[in-house]
Amino acid sequence: MKQFVKRFICGVLLVTTVCAVAGCYKDEAKTVAEERTPTSFRAIAATNASVEDKADLMVKNMSREDKIGQLILMGLDGTTLDEPQKEMMRKYRVGGILLDNNNMESKEQLRAFTKGIRDNANIASLAPPFIAIHRERMPYRPNVMIPWVEPNIISKKGLDAVGSLATRTSIEMRDLGFNLNLGPMVNTHSFYSYTQDLDRAAQIGELITKRYAVNQVFTAYQFFPCGADFTVPGMRVDVSKDALMDDDTRVFVQLIQSTAQERPMIMVNSVKVTSMDAKNPVSLSKPIITDWLRGELGFTGVGLSADIGYGATIT
């Protein structure tokens, strides 16, 4: 339980810090109960409105606590959803859950676990939660999931092989109750890269995202603006913006354009790109996230930070 609370507090700290630095709290009138339509998220989802109108209505219907909770993606302990964890989700209006190998025993157990997460959200009138996993980095667990072939190996087998694996794993994820994959890795200099070719990396990222979208599973490209050893808190990347645009960032530019309809997320790195922001890691950098990724490159989707344990909030 102590470890669970620690992981949750880390998530809250991450959200609070990112919002404060990136300026996502704007000078606008506070939302009060009388201004919100007292309609449940399930009722909104059942209407005949367009997806965009449903989303707008859901946001309008949210309290400030709901909106902050939507920014939290937290981990859980154990293989069942116990009462303290349910209460934590309800109290802080948590918008997403990240499961890992330690949460999994079997397909039946995992289906029950993810169903419990959804049911808890429904009971508390929460927005449908993201239930996520690092699919590409799951250890070999044949009793739980299809093994993911090493990226550099599957890439050499061709795009058909990549597409087939993406289709099978996305169907499996959907059936197990997941709706978000924290991947694919689209950097070209990582030990987990599919390829060192920029255009090929963009092709693979696009293919995986489109196959996952068919099965109602979102993806989150890793890691903007470049690959680096993000496990080292405070690591610096001394490279110019132009050099990045000729390297991994070019992959993101292509993917932002080619998969806009699928609405993938982008995971940002926690390293410091000193040429653009000498003080803050990418995950806290307004010049990099707001001005560059959103302003210049036109990304309008959801941005995710790296784990707080990897220095996502260390300046």
Question: Model regions: which residues?
Answer:
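N-terminal hydrophobic targeting/anchoring segments and the immediately downstream early-domain regions
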Residues: 25-140
